């Protein structure tokens, strides 16, 4: 019995690599992209809860970087560029949307 209690105490003492506030998995509720493993805190509409989501892949809709850290369209995966016409109003309203493309491939 004592050995079982010690084993349980050790198991609970080991820190969980997934955090409550940071290092969140896809689908978990977030307030800022810095909290997500994927670095994208995404919301469907202004009334919905934001959740961690995967970054946009090639030829997918994307958002340019935003100060708010919450996106209606996730930024592109590493190595891709979000081709978007940035506007001041779009930056304020978080509506600067574009398409992810591979800049290295387009130069060839």
UniProtKB/Swiss-Prot annotation:
Cellular component aspect of the GO annotation: extracellular region
Gene3D superfamilies in the record, alphabetically? Lipase, subunit A
Indicate whether Signal appears among the record's keywords: yes
Expression (tissue specificity): Expressed by the pancreas.
The record's InterPro entries line, in alphabetical order, gives: CLPS_chr, Colipase, Colipase_C, Colipase_CS, Colipase_N
Name the Gene Ontology biological process terms. Answer: digestion; lipid catabolic process; response to food
| MF GO annotations | enzyme activator activity; lipase binding
PROSITE patterns attached here?
A: COLIPASE_1, COLIPASE_2
Per UniProt, subcellular location reads as:
Secreted
**Annotated taurodeoxycholate binding sites:** 65
Keywords attached to this entry: Digestion, Disulfide bond, Lipid degradation, Lipid metabolism, Secreted, Signal
Concerning its family, UniProt says:
Belongs to the colipase family.
Quaternary arrangement and interactors, per the entry? Forms a 1:1 stoichiometric complex with pancreatic lipase.
Name assigned to this protein: Colipase B
Species per Swiss-Prot/TrEMBL record? Equus caballus
Name of the gene this protein is made from: CLPS2
């Amino acid at each position: 019995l004592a050995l079982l209690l010690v084993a349980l105490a050790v198991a609970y003492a080991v820190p969980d690599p997934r955090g409550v506030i940071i290092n969140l998995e896809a689908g978990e509720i977030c307030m800022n992209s810095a909290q997500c493993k994927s670095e994208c805190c995404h919301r469907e509409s202004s009334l919905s809860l934001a959740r961690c989501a995967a970054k946009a892949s090639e030829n997918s809709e994307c958002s340019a970087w935003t100060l708010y850290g919450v996106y209606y369209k996730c930024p592109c995966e590493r190595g891709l560029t979000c081709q978007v016409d940035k506007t001041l109003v779009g930056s304020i309203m978080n509506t600067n949307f574009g398409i992810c493309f591979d800049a290295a491939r387009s130069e060839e």
